[in-house]
């Protein structure tokens, strides 16, 4: 059976005005994935925290390097 190490990172928009902008968050995460180079994304999980400024979504990306 093959196995590999799964890695992850979480990302959100800056707190305050625009923190609930999901399209901006998706673009931000896409840019982060591209900067990592050759990776295979396994899963994306969206979370939403409720703050005094309103909803604050974040995404956790689970991935592995394709060179591993």
Language model features with spans:
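N-terminal acidic leader/helix
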Residues: 1-36
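Short, charge-rich amphipathic interface segments used for partner binding and complex assembly
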Residues: 28-68
